[in-house]
Amino acid sequence: MSRANPPSNSSGSRKISFNVSEQYDIQDVVGEGAYGVVCSAIHKPSGQKVAIKKITPFDHSMFCLRTLREMKLLRYFNHENIISILDIQKPRSYETFNEVYLIQELMETDMHRVIRTQDLSDDHCQYFIYQTLRALKAMHSANVLHRDLKPSNLLLNANCDLKVCDFGLARSAASQEDNSGFMTEYVATRWYRAPEIMLTFKEYTKAIDVWSVGCILAEMLSGKPLFPGKDYHHQLTLILDVLGTPTMEDYYGIKSRRAREYIRSLPFKKKVPFRTLFPKTSDLALDLLEKLLAFNPVKRITVEEALKHPYLEPYHDPDDEPTAPPIPEEFFDFDKHKDNLSKEQLKQFIYQEIMR
């Protein structure tokens, strides 16, 4: 292992050290997050361009949990529309193990950057949503909820290939354990959160990811977020401003009495037709959007149904939309016991996962 030539970040104000194998020639910083930095690199033996994600998770249990989920799930899925881990840098020893290096496919940009800088054609919207749903079909068939789908987690390259990334908040859909700990860790961007996440704390289904896809489609169609809430209350207000006050059936579908009382305290709102909000959009796109953004998760379209929707007909191929086997029950064992695990125990889990 070598201390590879450290890249400067864009401001050039500080150096970032990358302790990776000499097989990699580190190039540029391409992204930074709360507990990590991503650099582009060239794998010298093959000439392949890669992304190396350096993570320093060991200061916080939450970062350790996210890193563990990310490593385990990205290794589990082998799918064209889910970012893959090509390699993980093995540490010299447990004692000197302070950083995690994930070597991944290099993608050129992400949906957030693309939406900010250009208008997308209807054809682009179709192809991008199709690929997102194709990835989601694999996740949901494996009983995995992504829980943090948003434009910046959809990576893109010049041929318009799309890959979903960041599985740090993912969890098992099969798990029936109480979700009360879910919100404490749920720092996901509020704008793409399904209304049921804010209205009850008990059960989350695959429908939460479908809602996020609806928000992403709306943003691709208009160039701006559909529900850019400033806080919890504002978020719900924006959703109801568009969808209108829930019907009695949907109202009684809300499990939490407090949430029902809160909705009842709000002024009555009429539904705004999507045609008014998206005047230039095709009828088929709006029809799919309506179905993705159904207020009631029980009535929301499933991923399989969405893939069959006429809007995606140019791309839909039932023989080329693979599923993944359901994750084994013990896969998320560390999550079930997360409140009792020390940072040192989590570090051991991460080390074992890298060395396996």
Swiss-Prot record:
It is an enzyme of class 2 (transferase). GO terms for biological process: hyphal growth; MAPK cascade; positive regulation of appressorium formation; septin ring assembly; symbiont-mediated cell-to-cell migration by invasive hypha. Phosphorylated by MST7. PROSITE patterns: MAPK, PROTEIN_KINASE_ATP, PROTEIN_KINASE_DOM, PROTEIN_KINASE_ST. Disruption phenotype: Impairs the formation of appressoria and the ability to infect rice plants, even when inoculated onto wounded leaves. Leads to decreased transcription of the cell surface sensors MSB2 and SHO1. Blocks the transcription of both virulence genes GAS1 and GAS2 during appressorium formation. One of its GO terms (molecular function) is protein serine kinase activity. Its EC number is 2.7.11.24. Its cofactor is Mg(2+). Keywords: ATP-binding, Kinase, Magnesium, Nucleotide-binding, Serine/threonine-protein kinase, Transferase, Virulence. ATP binds at V30, G31, E32, G33, A34, Y35, G36, V37, V38, K53. It catalyses: L-seryl-[protein] + ATP = O-phospho-L-seryl-[protein] + ADP + H(+); L-threonyl-[protein] + ATP = O-phospho-L-threonyl-[protein] + ADP + H(+). Residues 24-312 form the Protein kinase domain. InterPro entries: Kinase-like_dom_sf, MAP_kinase, MAP_kinase_CS, Prot_kinase_dom, Protein_kinase_ATP_BS, Ser/Thr_kinase_AS. Belongs to the protein kinase superfamily. CMGC Ser/Thr protein kinase family. MAP kinase subfamily. Mitogen-activated protein kinase; part of the MST11-MST7-PMK1 MAP kinase (MAPK) cascade that is essential for appressorium formation, penetration and invasive growth. Central regulator of appressorium development that acts downstream of the cAMP signal. The MST11-MST7-PMK1 MAP kinase cascade transduces signals from the cell surface sensors MDB2 and SHO1 that recognize various surface signals such as surface hydrophobicity, cutin monomers, and rice leaf waxes. This is Mitogen-activated protein kinase PMK11. The lineage of its organism: Eukaryota, Fungi, Dikarya, Ascomycota, Pezizomycotina.
